[in-house]
Structure formats: C-alpha cells, structure tokens
C-alpha cells in the first residue's frame, strides 16, 4: 500500500474545478464546491499575491480544500490548504518546506514513469491525465483514455487520485466508473452556457468529497 508523507486528503475529493481567478473561486464555493484549485500561470509572485491571499481567505470561509497551483512559497506564507505541482516543478520546489508547513501536496502525472516520480515524493494525491483531448493547455503527451486511466487506478489502489483533462458533464460518469477518487474540470464549468447548472449537475455526479 502506498502511503503519503504529506498530510492526507480524503480519497474522494469530489468535484475539483481548476480556475484562474478569485472571481471563479468565490462563485464556485458559493455554489457548493468544496475542493478547488487556483491556477494562475506565468506571473511574478508579487503580481499574484493579493489574489492568492483572497482565494485562501475564501477557502477558509467556506471550509474548503483550496489548492494553489505552482506558487508554493506564497501558499506556505499565507497557509493555504494545499499546493499542486506539475512534474516540471518538482525538481525546483522545496518539498520539505511544503511538508514542514503542513500543506497538502498534489502532483500531476501523464504516464507510468511520471507516476513513479510522483510516488517518490509521497504526495497527498496524484492527478492522472490528460484523460481526453483538451484545449485548456498545450499537452506534450497523447490522451490516456479510460482504459489506461483504469490501469493506473488499479496500480495505485487506495491512493487518492484525481482524473483531469477534457472531462465534460457527459464524460464524468464513465471517468468515475474507473474507480478514480475525484474529477478535475476546467472548461466544463467555465465555458458552459450556464455555469451554475453545469456545476450543480457535476456536483450531483461527483459529490463534494468526503470529510
């Protein structure tokens, strides 16, 4: 059995939106989401610090699991619930500092080799993707598909996992059927014609996560 060294998270984190603004954080927490990630890319720390402070405050207000993507120093400074890192960030991040601060850690993976690298860090959860084609960001690898996702889930057993990449409202049930603990979504909410309805439907499917 794999065991995280970082503080644990529930196996089921529920619906896990990944958004790029405090406005979306507030909207979705108000709508009932309880696991969420702020992902702001390619800005200096001083440009994003105010947004990170505001997002963390919202997370506390709603008793939510708020992860900060990449900006681990600011996440430590302002005591976020957790940090999410890509593979490319692992070598340049002080993982011991994150752990010492008591923050949870999530790590992205795209194949078996990256899963091995992630497991060596013993994070709180492992993200598996991208499951389907996605327009949200440039991806260096091909989509995994459901069969490969299910294979990863079988390997990781009861380790907390999050599926990400091209997961729509229609695809969400088949993704969860693989046994993955949680689903991360981006455009399924932020580009929906009615984001409130989309969020409510996805919450019905994926839930808010375990306590």
From Swiss-Prot:
Binding, Mg(2+): 70, 89
EC number: 2.5.1.3
Enzyme superclass (EC): transferase
InterPro entries in the record: Aldolase_TIM, ThiamineP_synth_sf, ThiamineP_synth_TenI, TMP_synthase
Residues noted as binding 2-[(2R,5Z)-2-carboxy-4-methylthiazol-5(2H)-ylidene]ethyl phosphate in the record, renumbered to the chain: 134-136, 166, 186-187
GO cellular component: cytoplasm
Catalytic activity as recorded in UniProt: 2-[(2R,5Z)-2-carboxy-4-methylthiazol-5(2H)-ylidene]ethyl phosphate + 4-amino-2-methyl-5-(diphosphooxymethyl)pyrimidine + 2 H(+) = thiamine phosphate + CO2 + diphosphate; 2-(2-carboxy-4-methylthiazol-5-yl)ethyl phosphate + 4-amino-2-methyl-5-(diphosphooxymethyl)pyrimidine + 2 H(+) = thiamine phosphate + CO2 + diphosphate; 4-methyl-5-(2-phosphooxyethyl)-thiazole + 4-amino-2-methyl-5-(diphosphooxymethyl)pyrimidine + H(+) = thiamine phosphate + diphosphate
UniProt-annotated binding residues for 4-amino-2-methyl-5-(diphosphooxymethyl)pyrimidine: 37-41, 69, 108, 137
Pfam families in alphabetical order: TMP-TENI
Pathway: Cofactor biosynthesis; thiamine diphosphate biosynthesis; thiamine phosphate from 4-amino-2-methyl-5-diphosphomethylpyrimidine and 4-methyl-5-(2-phosphoethyl)-thiazole: step 1/1
Cofactor note: Binds 1 Mg(2+) ion per subunit.
UniProt KW keywords: Magnesium, Metal-binding, Thiamine biosynthesis, Transferase
GO biological process: thiamine biosynthetic process; thiamine diphosphate biosynthetic process
Reported cofactor(s): Mg(2+)
Source taxon at top rank: Bacteria
GO molecular function, one term: thiamine-phosphate diphosphorylase activity
Family (UniProt): Belongs to the thiamine-phosphate synthase family.
Function: Condenses 4-methyl-5-(beta-hydroxyethyl)thiazole monophosphate (THZ-P) and 2-methyl-4-amino-5-hydroxymethyl pyrimidine pyrophosphate (HMP-PP) to form thiamine monophosphate (TMP).
Protein name: Thiamine-phosphate synthase
Source organism phylogeny: Bacteria, Pseudomonadati, Pseudomonadota, Gammaproteobacteria, Enterobacterales
Gene behind this protein: thiE
